[in-house]
C-alpha cells in the first residue's frame, strides 16, 4: 500500500484505517455468505442484523437513553433542514434558530420556506467568530422548537454546552461533531448528522429522535418526508444505503474499541491542543480565526498575513502529502479538520510542517 495521505478534508473525511481494512477483507464475501453486503436483500436476516446492530450500538454509546429511535435517512443533513420544519412547525407556531454560521444560515433559509421563523440568538455581528452565550438565547412563547448547529465546520466554532429549553424541543445539527465527545441526549428532541465526517461514508444521514415527537407526522407530507415512515418501518420502508450503514456500524465498533465517547474526546482534545498551541505560539505568523472560548475541536481555522502566503502554504503542504488544508471558498483562509479518525500522528506532522513553513517564510 502506498503511504496514506495526511487527510484533513472537511467531509467526506478520513475514515479509520482499521475500519477500511475490515471492510476490504469482507467486501467480496461478507461472513461466508458468498456475497458482498452491497448485494444482499435489505429484507434478509443477514443485512437486517447489521442494520439493527448499528442502531443499538449508537444508542449504547450515548448511554441507552429511553424513548429514542435511530433512523437512517438519505438526502444528507440538507434534507433535514426542510424535514424538520415540515414535520414539527405547526400553524400558529414559530421555528426558533440560533444563528452561528454558514450551516445554521442554510437551515434557517429552508425553514423560512415552510413557515414563521425567529432568530433566538445570533453571532453574525462578530462575523460568526464567537458563539452566542446560552443565556442570550431568547425563545418565543409560541416556539415549535429551537434549532442549534453544534459545530460550524466552515467558521470553526463549536458549542461546549447546550441550552435548557424546557418543554420546547431542542434540535441539534451535529453533522460535524457527533460522537466526538459525550453529551446528554435527553436534552434533545432530535439530533441529526450526515455520516461523512465522524460516522462513516457519505450517503447516510443518522437521525436520533424522541419517539413521542414522531408518533404521527402531518398527513399532507409526502411519504419519504415523514419521520413516522422511518419510525414505523425501522428505516426499511424503501431500500436503505446498506453499505453505508454497514460502514457506520464498523465505525461505531471502532469508537467502542477506543474507550467510547470519553476516550475519543480525550484524543480529540489532545489533537486540537497541539495545533492550537502551534498557532498561538507562532508570534502572530498564524492567527486563529475564532475566539478562544468558541474554538472547535473538529475544525481548526486560521489565517496568514496575506492570501498569497496562504496559497503558498496550501501548495507547499500538498507537496508534502497534506490534503484538505484550504479554507472553505466562502471564507478563505486555512482549515484543518481533525475528526475522530484523523490520527494524532497526522496532527504532529502538520505542526512540524507549520513550523518549517514559518521558518522559511517568516
UniProtKB/Swiss-Prot annotation:
The scientific name of the source species is: Niallia circulans
Q: What is this protein called?
A: Phosphoserine aminotransferase
Question: Could you say which cofactors this protein requires?
Answer: pyridoxal 5'-phosphate
N6-(pyridoxal phosphate)lysine occurs at 197
* Broad class of enzyme this protein falls into: transferase
Activity's thermal dependence: Thermal denaturation midpoint (Tm) is 71 degrees Celsius at pH 6 and is lowered around 58 degrees Celsius at pH 8.5 and 10.
Q: Supply the Pfam families for this chain.
A: Aminotran_5
Give a GO molecular function annotation for the protein: pyridoxal phosphate binding
Q: Does the keyword Cytoplasm apply?
A: yes
Reaction(s) this enzyme catalyzes, per UniProt: O-phospho-L-serine + 2-oxoglutarate = 3-phosphooxypyruvate + L-glutamate; 4-(phosphooxy)-L-threonine + 2-oxoglutarate = (R)-3-hydroxy-2-oxo-4-phosphooxybutanoate + L-glutamate
Q: Where does pyridoxal 5'-phosphate bind?
A: 77-78, 103, 153, 173, 196, 238-239
Cytoplasm among keywords = yes
Which residues are recorded as binding L-glutamate? 43
Instruction: Identify the stretch annotated as signal peptide in this record.
Output: none
**UniProt gene name:** serC
Amino acid at each position: 500500500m502506498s503511504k496514506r495521505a495526511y487527510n484533513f478534508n472537511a467531509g467526506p473525511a478520513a475514515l479509520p484505517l482499521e475500519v477500511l481494512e475490515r471492510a476490504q477483507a469482507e467486501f467480496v464475501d461478507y461472513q461466508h455468505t458468498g456475497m458482498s453486503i452491497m448485494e444482499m436483500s435489505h429484507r434478509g436476516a443477514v443485512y437486517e442484523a447489521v442494520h439493527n446492530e448499528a442502531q443499538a450500538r449508537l444508542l449504547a454509546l450515548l448511554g441507552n437513553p429511553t424513548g429514542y429511535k435511530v433512523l437512517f435517512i438519505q438526502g444528507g443533513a440538507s434534507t433535514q433542514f426542510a424535514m424538520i420544519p415540515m414535520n414539527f412547525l405547526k400553524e400558529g407556531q414559530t421555528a426558533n434558530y440560533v444563528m452561528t454560521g454558514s450551516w445554521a444560515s442554510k437551515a434557517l433559509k429552508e425553514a423560512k420556506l415552510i413557515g414563521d421563523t425567529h432568530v433566538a440568538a445570533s453571532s453574525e455581528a462578530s462575523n460568526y467568530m464567537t458563539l452566542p452565550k446560552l443565556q442570550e438565547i431568547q425563545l418565543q412563547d409560541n416556539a415549535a422548537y429551537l434549532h442549534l448547529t453544534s459545530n460550524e465546520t466552515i467558521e470553526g466554532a463549536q458549542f461546549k454546552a447546550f441550552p435548557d429549553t424546557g418543554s420546547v424541543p431542542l434540535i441539534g445539527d451535529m453533522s460535524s461533531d457527533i460522537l466526538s465527545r459525550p453529551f446528554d441526549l435527553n436534552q434533545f428532541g432530535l439530533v441529526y448528522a450526515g455520516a461523512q465526517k465522524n460516522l462513516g461514508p457519505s450517503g447516510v444521514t443518522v437521525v436520533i429522535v424522541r419517539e413521542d415527537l414522531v408518533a404521527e407526522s402531518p398527513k399532507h407530507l409526502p411519504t419519504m418526508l415523514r419521520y413516522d415512515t422511518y419510525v414505523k418501518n425501522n428505516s426499511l420502508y424503501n431500500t436503505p444505503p446498506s453499505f453505508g450503514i454497514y460502514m457506520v456500524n464498523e465505525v461505531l465498533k471502532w469508537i467502542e474499541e477506543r474507550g467510547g465517547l470519553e476516550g475519543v474526546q480525550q484524543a480529540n482534545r489532545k489533537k486540537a491542543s497541539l495545533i492550537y498551541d502551534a498557532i498561538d505560539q507562532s508570534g502572530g505568523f498564524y492567527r486563529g480565526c475564532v475566539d478562544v472560548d468558541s474554538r472547535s475541536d473538529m475544525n481548526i481555522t486560521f489565517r496568514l498575513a496575506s492570501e498569497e502566503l496562504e496559497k503558498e502554504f496550501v501548495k507547499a503542504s500538498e507537496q508534502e502529502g497534506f490534503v484538505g488544508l484550504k479554507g472553505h471558498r466562502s471564507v478563505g483562509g486555512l482549515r484543518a479538520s481533525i475528526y475522530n479518525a484523523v490520527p494524532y500522528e497526522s496532527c504532529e506532522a502538520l505542526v512540524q510542517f507549520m513550523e518549517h513553513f514559518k521558518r522559511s517564510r517568516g
